[in-house]
């Protein structure tokens, strides 16, 4: 077994916490960074900058440096809210250029088997936004997974009694896929072909 210095071992451990990074990738990344101290310094500084400056928007719960975020403070359709699971899903929707409304990030999906309940998500905050009476449509853009579908159904049951139109992305997106990995054209077709729930 190879023994590394304490600091390198710690770096490897931290890198392996990233999604999709195992032992080999962590080692490759660590040695790449060590070859170029300037890159290592720049990475460390950018991580500290993100930690200090990036937060969640108090309106949509997307990622921002300004509060409210750019999408919440610009002139977009204020009558439509697109509900997504994670902040990166906003990027997928924006790449399509098909959606012109506002967003709401749940920060997950319902998953009773994993202990994720409505109280763990930003559902209460969504319902509070809907109380204003200005919202005419909620587009549910949760992932097409069991958890995403369960979340969409749960939200539909909460929102329908408010006489707000509830729509879902069209099912042109493959079942079991995550929205953040879908190409812009497919997302655009899905937004244009959304259907009432």
Curated annotation (Swiss-Prot):
Disulfide bonds: none annotated. It comes from Geotalea daltonii (strain DSM 22248 / JCM 15807 / FRC-32) (Geobacter daltonii). This is Recombination protein RecR. It comes from the Bacteria. A zinc finger (C4-type) spans 57-72. May play a role in DNA repair. It seems to be involved in an RecBC-independent recombinational process of DNA repair. It may act with RecF and RecO. The keyword Zinc applies. Keywords: DNA damage, DNA recombination, DNA repair, Metal-binding, Zinc, Zinc-finger. Residues 79-174 form the Toprim domain. GO terms for molecular function: DNA binding; zinc ion binding. The gene is recR. InterPro entries: DNA_Rcmb_RecR, Rcmb_RecR, Rcmb_RecR_Znf, TOPRIM_dom, TOPRIM_RecR. The keyword DNA damage applies. Pfam families: RecR_C (PF21175), RecR_HhH (PF21176), RecR_ZnF (PF02132), Toprim_4 (PF13662).
